[in-house]
Amino acid sequence: GLVSTMASGLKSQFGTMGKPFNAGIAASNAVKAAKLSELNFISNPDGLGSSQGFIETHSPNTHLSVYNRSTRLPFRFDKVNYKLHACCHGLHAAIEALNIAKTEKYLSPQGVRAINITVSSSWRGVCDIEKPQTGLQGKFSYHYIAALVICGFNTAALDSFFDEMLANIEINNQMRKITVSFNENMEDSYSSVIVHSEGLSEKNFEFDLKKNQKAIDAYPRLKDKAESLLDKEKTKTLYSLLSDKDNCSAQAIGSWIRAF
């Protein structure tokens, strides 16, 4: 298993330590490549787009004309999406829809009778672990994250995905109420959540990460996530640096990181 994930990124690793390990290898290799480049280590400068290069090797049907070094177009991120929950990206639209249902008083633990979550077929076999056995598997389970939201746990907090949480009786009771459906015509950024609650009419809650991202007030939620991962004092120092945009430097942020 470790050999396979060190050689490539595999969906079979989802729900195990192999997945973040693979991402860590990629980050480590990026740093190593930058350091080697600084030392004038020589490689094919067009290794990405040349004949038999990275793009052609991994996607033989790709039109290499899209990758044209002579145009000198800059490579940039066209947007930044924030990961506000400590779990697989495929669960995020469902969590946002469930949060809306929670706000509208549809998700009391005693009142929920059944919830059906419908998502794109692209998430089948990725984050649809029905009965997670570990906290890591919970990060890839619609059943588990729905139960967390119903029970009022913070989906941005690491301790919501500790192994001992799988023994929580109330979480297990709520997981039994969840069903998951897949629709091949749905965008992978979209989720539909139909809630059946006692004394309330059936209601469908929807969320599309592409279309509704601006509706999310990211700043306080990112701060909440930072506090859950670090601590309030460290987060306070970081945010005081970031709030002074005119004087905030990479060096200052680097010093903050080294202080850990």
Question: Language model features by range: what are they?
Answer:
Residues 1-10, 74:
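Conserved catalytic cysteine-centered active-site region
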Residues 5-8, 32, 96:
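Generic structural signal for well-ordered, non-membrane alpha-helices
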Residues 15-28, 35-260:
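Terminal-appendage/accessory-domain detector
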